[in-house]
């Protein structure tokens, strides 16, 4: 089996790289701007390259990975915040994650065509993980509009003109699945107290 590789955006102190190594996925690079968390990951994962500020990265220039994980800042989505949602300066950085994945896939598609390989199911990154707070389900101009945007933007990485219906009953459920042509998107709310890290 081919080894999976991880790129970690909004890396913090390396939670995604730690989870990856516990699941036989090799962390290759990370993006973070805060010095202390970067020092922690440099110590814990010396082989992982630090790429810096997500807003200054271009996906075509990043090392190819199979998985992109990111937990964009939650302050604008959180029920404890001002609820600016994805329009907020911090939580809106989610769109940078989508941009980078699209740029990486475009570059990988080009590379594979140059080598005359089949492309559709092998374009990398193949997987994207987004971690955030349950407040994402209810933020936005209309209740839950931001999570609707998240789902559409993630689906549009694979299918540019896809349209996702709003939540049945007007509210997003804590778990769900979207099946598309050659892609799927799933979401789950995990309660941290059951994972040994009550918050």
PLM region spans:
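Extreme N-terminal starter segment of soluble prokaryotic enzymes
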Residues: 2-6
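Class I SAM-dependent methyltransferase "Motif I" SAM/SAH-binding loop
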Residues: 8-14
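Short beta-strand element of Class I
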Residues: 27-28
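Conserved SAM/SAH-binding beta-strand->alpha-helix loop
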Residues: 34-35
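Conserved SAM-binding loop
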Residues: 41-42
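Conserved SAM-binding strand-loop segment of SAM-dependent methyltransferases
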Residues: 47-53
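Class I S-adenosyl-L-methionine
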Residues: 57-65, 77-199
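Short SAM/SAH-binding signature in class I
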Residues: 65-71
